[in-house]
Design a protein with these regions (language model features):
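Short hydrophobic beta/alpha edge segments that flank linear recognition/processing sites
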Residues: 44-68, 87-104, 140-164, 184-198
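Short beta-strand-turn/beta-hairpin segments enriched in glycine/proline and small hydrophobics
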Residues: 8-38, 57-74, 102-135, 153-171
Length: 216
């Protein structure tokens, strides 16, 4: 079993992730009026309809395209020597330091601590009706799973096939797929927690909720 408390302490020691902002295609770079230490924001609004801070503009064939911040963060590096230069696709322009939110810390811990049942291929996924009914009546934690149990329906190109769960016995702790949205092959669909590990995981999630301070 993973040492969940140790994992939380490691995250506390480096409570951020660095995001490299790279060019999506070739073009001439013009940086926005920003400097190292400035704070930028990502998309906002209920539907993320408000774009993030403009970091730079990439112009190709007289067609300028803004490069926007994907997350809230602090600029910690700008490759200002690229100003006005033609660059290839994938060229790093700057680095943002994004301070982790409470929800992101919980998500990171669960991804490490739970058994992740992954999508075998790109498709849409649904619970079988019996399981869906149980989740609606209570919650996902009420569903006990065992190896070989028929659990999901995989829908691809108008073809639906049952998908059996493979992994340790336990309860469904996290659901990562969204109905009517395609999940890529290898993407986690469910996070399953063995029954004997449930108290430890619940304890550390409670610690995150009470101890974690939002920053930035």
């Amino acid at each position: 079993m993973i040492d969940i408390s140790k994992l939380l302490d490691e995250i506390k020691a480096s409570p951020y992730r660095e995001i490299v902002i790279s060019t999506p295609h070739t073009g001439v770079v013009t940086f926005a009026d920003l400097k190292v230490g400035d704070t930028v924001v990502g998309p906002q609004g209920q539907w993320k309809e408000k774009p993030g801070t403009r970091l730079a503009t990439l112009e190709r064939e007289r067609n300028p395209k803004p490069i926007l911040a994907p997350e809230k963060g602090e600029i910690c590096l700008i490759h200002s020597d690229l100003e006005g230069r033609f660059v290839e696709a994938g060229t790093p322009l700057m680095i943002l330091r994004h301070m982790l939110t409470r929800a992101e810390v919980e998500h990171a811990i669960l991804k490490k601590a739970l058994h992740l049942f992954r999508a075998p291929e790109r498709a849409k996924y649904y619970f079988i009706p019996k399981v869906e009914k149980k989740i609606r009546a209570s919650d996902a934690h009420s569903v006990q799973v065992r190896d070989g149990m028929e659990l999901l329906i995989m829908s691809r190109m108008k073809r639906e096939v049952p998908l059996n769960y493979t992994g340790p016995d336990g309860v469904i702790y996290a659901i990562y797929f969204t109905i009517n949205e395609n999940m890529d092959a290898g993407a986690p669909l469910l996070g399953v927690c063995p029954q004997d590990q449930l108290p430890a995981i619940q304890d550390v999630i409670m610690r995150v909720q009470t101890e974690w301070t939002e920053r930035g």
